[in-house]
Amino acid sequence: MRNMKAIFIKQIRSMIKNPLLIGQGIMFIIMIVVMTFLMSPDRECDVCIPAYVCETCLRENPIHSLPSPTIAGMFSVMFMGMVMIGSSSALVQEDKTTHNLRFMTMSGMKPYQYLIGTASALFLVAVSLLFFYALAGRYFGLDTLRFLLLTGSGALVSILFGIAMGLSKMPAIATPISILFGFGPMFSNFNENMARWLHFTYTQQVNLAIYHLDDGLQQRPFLIIGATGLLTLIAFVWMHRKGELRW
């Protein structure tokens, strides 16, 4: 317990000294606020379009039948998928390059202690930032809790994935994977084939669940998020036993 607490405090200090994660999170919040004001709906134009025109467009272009993304939802998924995976991996790689990880291992630290301590610190920062994402997206009351539950659980999976990639022998693979999980759901809003391919990824499930947030939380997104997190933990344990992790 003492080791996990020390790792937690150490990682919080590292993120304050090198505030890349916090800076990117704040940048996305500002973009949500700005784009919300710039992309206000044109109600007069919507009213003047005859109903038969909309039906014809849906038949000819099925992309319009996909759920319309919310601005807060898009940037939240980008932060949760791309930024959290990249930042988690970078934080672990920093510990490796500065030899802090080796010193902690020599002092008796266990792999699960490092995983829990680091993941807890990253999760605290992520949820704190996601709270302001909810406010910027105008999610209040119960919707705020639903939003945080969805994005927070997705962020936790990204953190676990990033830590595992950062400790692996190929940490560079975290970058293309984070781009896929971060930008994939955004592009899937405008491409039916991509939406079909990414349907069972945890970031896409969060993206769809945010769109239907007013209808309440469904069980399916959490099943996919939980299954992804479990597979990540299993992969972490397997890589550790096979000696694929570099401490």
Predicted stretch roles:
Residues 34-44, 165-204:
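Transmembrane helix segments
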Residues 1-28:
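Aromatic- and glycine-rich beta-strand/loop motifs that create alpha-glucan
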Residues 85-107:
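Transmembrane helix boundary and interhelical loop/hinge segments in multi-pass membrane proteins
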Residues 11, 15, 226-247:
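Junction motif at the cytosolic side of a transmembrane helix
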Residues 111-112, 118-169:
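Alpha-helical transmembrane segments and their short interhelical loops
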Residues 31, 35, 40, 67-91:
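Long, hydrophobic alpha-helical segments
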Residues 81-88, 132, 160-164, 235-236:
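Hydrophobic/aromatic residues in alpha-helical transmembrane segments
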Residues 2-6, 190-223:
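Short hydrophobic, aromatic-rich alpha-helical segments embedded in or entering the lipid bilayer
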